[in-house]
């Protein structure tokens, strides 16, 4: 959610959003970089959602190095612990010019930004209803393709029996880390979609 918001807040609104920190350290907006307008909005939002997923995947890879050595409840506890650490880091005042500290990030494109209005400002086509379903359908399609791939079959083998999967030559550590990163990627995209729904992002 933070990655999406930081990358899509319009340049003209950054000073008002980051007023406690004298402005934002990030002085660009992806929709503006893509030329603005309807096409710039679509491309900018898609790029921001993908980057949000990538940032989440990179963080998951770093966390997975020590955490994936654990199993069962200990893995869940360690993951929750790292989540709280990351939340505290995002609220750190030193990072305020980037994350806005403990304050909410606002003014970024939301689902209502995709509605088509006439000259009087009245909504003539409410695309905000269909955009989230379209994005979720794309994510589900990618997941289905992944599940039916070679990697997906390896994931299912590990789920059923780790010992048997390792005996078949499947690298458990590599595939567990990959599954952790892939799930975090979609969680990052989901965070961006939640920010668009909630109209703000706050740790």
Short names for language-model regions:
Residues 1-203:
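Transmembrane alpha-helices and adjacent helix-loop boundaries
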């Amino acid at each position: 959610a933070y990655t999406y918001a930081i990358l899509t807040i319009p340049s003209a609104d950054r000073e008002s959003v980051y007023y406690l920190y004298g402005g934002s350290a990030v002085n660009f907006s992806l929709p503006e970089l893509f030329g603005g307008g309807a096409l710039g909005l679509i491309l900018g939002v898609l790029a921001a959602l993908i980057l949000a997923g990538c940032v989440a995947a990179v963080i998951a890879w770093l966390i997975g190095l020590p955490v994936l050595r654990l199993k069962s409840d200990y893995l869940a506890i360690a993951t929750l612990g790292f989540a709280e650490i990351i939340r505290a880091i995002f609220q750190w005042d030193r990072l305020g010019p980037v994350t806005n500290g403990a304050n909410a990030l606002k003014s970024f494109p939301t689902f209502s930004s995709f509605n088509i209005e006439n000259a009087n400002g009245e909504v003539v086509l409410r695309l905000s209803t269909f955009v989230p379903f379209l994005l979720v359908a794309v994510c589900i399609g990618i997941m289905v393709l992944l599940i039916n791939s070679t990697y997906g079959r390896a994931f299912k083998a590990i789920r059923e029996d780790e010992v048997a999967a390792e005996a078949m030559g499947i690298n458990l550590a590599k595939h567990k880390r990959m599954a952790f990163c892939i799930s975090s990627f979609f969680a990052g995209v989901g965070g961006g979609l939640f920010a668009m729904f909630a109209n703000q992002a706050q740790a």
